[in-house]
């Protein structure tokens, strides 16, 4: 999304001035697999949050490799290093951005919290998010919402979601891919495992997709204007 707007630096300045706690977002040119693009970095208290690499496996479901899970970040109990939905809502309310943006961010967080509450069999008020994960996810969600508001698309068409496969390690132990919360959020949405082993769609990503999706399906006939 960032590559679709005319002035990236202006947007990043706006995002970093929104008051995201402990977070600084930056973007730099990057080359991966020979393709040039933009790498967006989220630094929490000076340390960059990184995603695990995924591996291409024909259809090798026999692989037992376990990947780290970065965006679930939830527990069904309290702790001083965790934030509940009430805490998250208060953080969002303090952001220096449009009220419509804040409302969308809160709604996306509610999707995640609702899915986690169903997975853990607890009330949504008992769901808590890890402190560092909360800062990282809040930056991801807020940035995406601000970009959607900047672009003002008439509709958002979502292709079938590739979830990945295998196993992922989180605070609760080793879980299947898609993680239980991701699977809950994607109920009723066209999905496939794909051929890349690892977690390709997190609860955060699934919540953003389902919240903004106007329709699901393969790419319709269209003319590309920006990539």
Question: Where in the sequence are the language-model features?
Answer:
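Short beta-strand-to-turn element immediately C-terminal to the catalytic PLP-Schiff-base lysine
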Residues: 2-3, 211
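Glycine-rich nucleotide/cofactor/substrate-binding loop typically near the N-terminus or early
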Residues: 4-119, 179, 187-206, 219-222
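Residues at or immediately flanking beta-strands
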Residues: 24, 126-128, 155-157
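Divalent metal-coordination and catalytic microenvironments
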Residues: 40, 136, 209
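Self-splicing inteins and homing endonuclease
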Residues: 41-43, 133, 161
